[in-house]
């Protein structure tokens, strides 16, 4: 669930998972997907097909000087109405929300 995804990402961020701190830092570095504009986005995408639906995820956190913001976006699409932009809209929708909340500016 999205809640479980955010809880997991928070544990990774706080380095409270049952792995070495070094390995958790490596994972966080690999998850760095955008840097600049006064913030970093650390994230991971996912996509599966289940019961006639495409299910797309974008999970991670935005790190700014004044704090961090965690997110999990899950989109469902009926496979009978495939849209070419389904893969990119996970990120686009999430970024628009954070922009409207004045958390990011790009």
Predicted regions and their residues:
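Structured C-terminal helix/loop/strand segments within mature extracytoplasmic catalytic/sensor domains
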Residues: 6-106
């Amino acid at each position: 669930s999205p809640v479980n995804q955010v809880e997991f990402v928070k544990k990774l961020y706080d380095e409270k998972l049952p792995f070495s701190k070094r390995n958790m830092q490596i994972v966080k570095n690999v998850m760095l997907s955008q840097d600049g504009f006064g913030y970093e986005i650390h994230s991971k995408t996912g996509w599966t097909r289940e019961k006639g639906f495409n299910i797309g995820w974008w999970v991670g956190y935005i790190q700014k000087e004044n704090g961090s913001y965690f997110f999990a976006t899950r989109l469902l699409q009926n496979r009978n109405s495939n849209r070419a932009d389904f893969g990119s809209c996970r990120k686009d929708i999430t970024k628009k929300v954070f922009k409207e909340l004045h958390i990011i500016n790009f």
